[in-house]
Amino acid sequence: MAKGEFVRTKPHVNVGTIGHVDHGKTTLTAALTYVAAAENPNVEVKDYGDIDKAPEERARGITINTAHVEYETAKRHYSHVDCPGHADYIKNMITGAAQMDGAILVVSAADGPMPQTREHILLARQVGVPYIVVFMNKVDMVDDPELLDLVEMEVRDLLNQYEFPGDEVPVIRGSALLALEQMHRNPKTRRGENEWVDKIWELLDAIDEYIPTPVRDVDKPFLMPVEDVFTITGRGTVATGRIERGKVKVGDEVEIVGLAPETRRTVVTGVEMHRKTLQEGIAGDNVGVLLRGVSREEVERGQVLAKPGSITPHTKFEASVYVLKKEEGGRHTGFFSGYRPQFYFRTTDVTGVVQLPPGVEMVMPGDNVTFTVELIKPVALEEGLRFAIREGGRTVGAGVVTKILE
């Protein structure tokens, strides 16, 4: 059954709330669903309690608590992620369990930016969250308008420090709680009927306008991680896997990238799904790709098939990493430079050597750290690629490539 249609009239965008504990991320998330629901019968309201007791999910062997809500505006459909705990944010952003096309940074006007505000902005920069919109919350608790200006200036400075365009980022001032209380009193409150509800609309407008609709996976250059390889007598070698992005059809040139000393170029002579011929395989399809003139020995699990020139093999990179705590099934002890675990990229493990940054002697379970890795074999890498760190098959950490070195 190819190409079942999921009918969606509006473009889809993934967002999430980030920011310091108790600055109002979850209250704002609830308010967004209520406000959007008043104008759109398709939106399901979620209350603070529904969001706060976020279900556990697993991503790359790590347990994370994450709440997912959905809402829509006249222009777009949104999936929104909110995490109850600070550690959940770190794990979520590093594993990419909840990819964000843009983030809503919540800052309490009463406190201004706090340590986790900074940490979440840094994480957003490292893991490649491309856009941030700011909601300055709890402005009803601040009497002095100059103080509000000061907090806004501090937030913009902080964004600039981490290479976000702090001077251009929209900053909306409001009170998530007062908006939510109004929606509880009258769930049908519309735009223009209450000043605090209007602030939530102002935020929705800013998200609509400022965060661009992302390029769909299917429109990106073709890439398929190889999961398995077999031979069809008389026809040649087939590589199977799930297409990560782009599309592929007979006659396309592709490269086999990674693990081997040389990147090899070949031509696709067939694309199959469940033993039936496909006109074209697209992102998300599990397919077999028949490769011209390639022997069974020349392609293996862990390599990728990709559009020529779109991705290259590398051995050395910098990464942002979360190291699992003992209670999460991680190591019981710390590790030093020279540590040699396996790095699991897409479909395979490759051994690598860790080099800690200057001034860091040792990394403990539960830490979030940036370090350099040198792999013993080249792998198809790019910035933003997620991986797991494993020892003997069990996950001890999760990371994201932040910079390619060689």
Curated annotation (Swiss-Prot):
Oligomeric form and interacting partners: Monomer. Binds to the 70S ribosome, contacts tmRNA during trans-translation.
Example of a GO cellular component annotation carried by this entry: cytosol
Cell location: Cytoplasm
Organism: Thermus thermophilus (strain ATCC 27634 / DSM 579 / HB8)
One term of GO molecular function: RNA binding
Entry keyword annotation includes Cytoplasm: yes
Function of the protein: GTP hydrolase that promotes the GTP-dependent binding of aminoacyl-tRNA to the A-site of ribosomes during protein biosynthesis. EF-Tu-GDP binds to the acceptor arm of tmRNA by interacting with its acceptor arm, suggesting that GTP hydrolysis by EF-Tu is essential for tmRNA function.
Region annotated G2, chain positions: 61-65
Primary location recorded for the protein, binned into one broad class: cytoplasm
Positions of GTP binding: 19-26, 82-86, 137-140
Family the entry assigns: Belongs to the TRAFAC class translation factor GTPase superfamily. Classic translation factor GTPase family. EF-Tu/EF-1A subfamily.
Catalytic activity: GTP + H2O = GDP + phosphate + H(+)
Protein name: Elongation factor Tu-A
Origin: domain of life: Bacteria
Annotated spans, G4: 137-140
Matching Pfam families: GTP_EFTU, GTP_EFTU_D2, GTP_EFTU_D3
Region (G3): 82-85
